Amino acid sequence: KAGGAFMTNQTFEQLKKTYESGRTRPLAWRRAQLNALRRLVTENRDAFVSSAMADLGKPAAETVLMELNLVAGEAQFVRNRLSLWTARHPKAMHWMLQPAAGWTIAEPKGVVLIISPWNYPVLLALEPMADALAAGNAVCLKPSELSPNTSKLLAELVPQYLDSEAVRVVEGGPKETGELLKCPFNHIFYTGGGHVGKIVMRAAAEHLTPVTLELGGKSPCFVDRTADINVAARRIAWGKFTNAGQTCVAPDYVLATPDVAEALAERIAVAITEFYGEDPKASPDFGRIINDRHFERLCKLLPVGTVPPEEPSSPLVQVASAVGAAMDMVGRRFNAVTTGRGGAGEMAGSANNAAKPTAGSNMAAADDGATASAAVEPSEIHKVPGVFDLAGRIVCGGKVGRAARYIAPTVLYGTSPDAPVMKEEIFGPILPILVVEDAESEIGRASCRERV
């Protein structure tokens, strides 16, 4: 495990020395590394499945199909095309340069730094590595510290299978990453969020190092009457809730026209049940949130702003009591500052009456799965369904469990563009559905969003 400026700089210098020796250039060396990389993932399948389960609660099928198989396939794909990609290709020359002849040759860049994320800790570490090795580069891999079991496994296996003089793994956190970014790598490949992406870009600018950023964003799906609603619902549900929604290219939200929006929401809920059963928490195919920080962030995006009990006795009763408690508290404070008395008074009573469920409201829809705790601070009152709530109503899901970092696959219907859930990349199992008139106006709105 490398740590500190000396170790990270020493790692870079050793890789640079190996690259400059010409060791990584021959096609035979590249093919050997790609073959070894393929063996690394196929011969250690069970170990990777276990590490991903420990880090993310990721189902075995997801790890095999969406990580290990893709890495093996990428290694094979680029290996089969090396001769074509490295061949000289004739290039037409300007008439002023005649009778000169020209051609293009694909050259390695040098020492490549790969900073990989936690959500697909094998795929997004080893797939870029396959491409960098195929191009004849030396590689330094910095896996995410948020998936420590997979990071440790990669650090153990990579030197066993690949050329340890040309490929290194540096474990650690932000400190080690920061030290690596001080080194003059020839290319940096970063997968993650925009905040760290900016840090990477600023550091790379010091050395004029080219950078590839694979970032997330708010990628919508648009559905209108021309779509097969059943097919669209199943595809959206699969893309959104795989890996518990922690996929950078997952559908972030849905734009649907009024004639199909409600039916689509219902069909997505049906698809969720087909994929994960009546209780997704008990499903072996549904994952968990990576850590407590992301869990709490996602809970704040739900219509109910406080984390509910894992096994609520009655969602409707708890939502109603939460609103009543919040309104009662507001009433007592109002009376305290206006009359000096601490009772709830008439205002609290009228507020409670005003908060009763009505047909078509979020309150009336609480039976669909919304849950809430019984204690709501006045500052949180806008987060309770039916009270200034912009997130929409919960069609299905909404249940959470802090101990297991579980958030049920959740569909929100009638979400406002101004809701908190629409202000950031969700990166979790929450799917807002916005009702829109057409695609054109929403394309304009999406185009005006900030990049990160």
Model segments located where?
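Rossmann-like NAD(P) dinucleotide-binding subdomain of oxidoreductase/dehydrogenase enzymes
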Residues: 93-231, 262, 267, 273, ...
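ALDH superfamily catalytic-core signature
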Residues: 195-416, 438-444
